[in-house]
Amino acid sequence: MPWTILLFAAGSLAIPAPSIRLVPPYPSSQEDPIHIACMAPGNFPGANFTLYRGGQVVQLLQAPTDQRGVTFNLSGGSSKAPGGPFHCQYGVLGELNQSQLSDLSEPVNVSFPVPTWILVLSLSLAGALFLLAGLVAVALVVRKVKLRNLQKKRDRESCWAQINFDSTDMSFDNSLFTVSAKTMPEEDPATLDDHSGTTATPSNSRTRKRPTSTSSSPETPEFSTFRACQ
């Protein structure tokens, strides 16, 4: 066979690695079968193929003498067919019936779509968490606003109490500055003399003077009873 002569001439040279790919029908769950095709180069028909998963042998197949590849069919639900990276390798018999193995192929990953109910549940939980976070944020904002309004109300009440107290003090101070100008009533000199038991004389009448006030209408001082409340 041509490949036997090639191997004999190559000696210890490595055999080219095969190609690997996932073929349809593709699995939609872990219960569905997995189909993986492994193909050797054109000069190596009828080779023996080995499928690996994580360094462990999963399945062995031999290609027909006129074909250069095989398709591995891994039944669903089997412990040997979980999802994960797969590699394949092929081997041929060289001169003196010595087995020659190729390099490992590139990895192929098999993943399963997430079930719909899990997706719906995840979205529901995420929405509930976002809603809860939003409610907590709104509650904190409302509480902060209420505390601020309550503080403003307390400040206003304290300010008005201080103003009323200051107004009372100022009213008391105003009474000290109020001038009471009352004019004493005039009395007849004769009446005064009668009370004193003496006869009024012109000189006495002239010496008596009517009391007068220094101001007929004193003005009330102007001031403000309101003070700025910080």
Swiss-Prot record:
Chief localization: membrane
Superkingdom in the source lineage: Eukaryota
InterPro entries: C19orf38_Ig (IPR041066), HIDE1 (IPR040438), Ig-like_dom_sf (IPR036179), Ig-like_fold (IPR013783)
Region span, Disordered: 186-230
Residue spans crossing the bilayer: 118-138
Pfam families: Ig_C19orf38 (PF17737)
Biased composition (Low complexity): 212-230
Extracellular face residues: 20-117
Residues in the signal sequence: 1-19
Cytoplasmic side: 139-230
Cellular component aspect of the GO annotation: membrane
Location of the protein in the cell: Membrane
Residues listed as glycosylation sites in the UniProt record: 48, 97
Record key words, sorted: Glycoprotein, Membrane, Signal, Transmembrane, Transmembrane helix
Its membrane topology: Single-pass type I membrane protein
PANTHER family named in the record: PROTEIN HIDE1
Protein's recorded name: Protein HIDE1
Originating organism: Homo sapiens (Human)
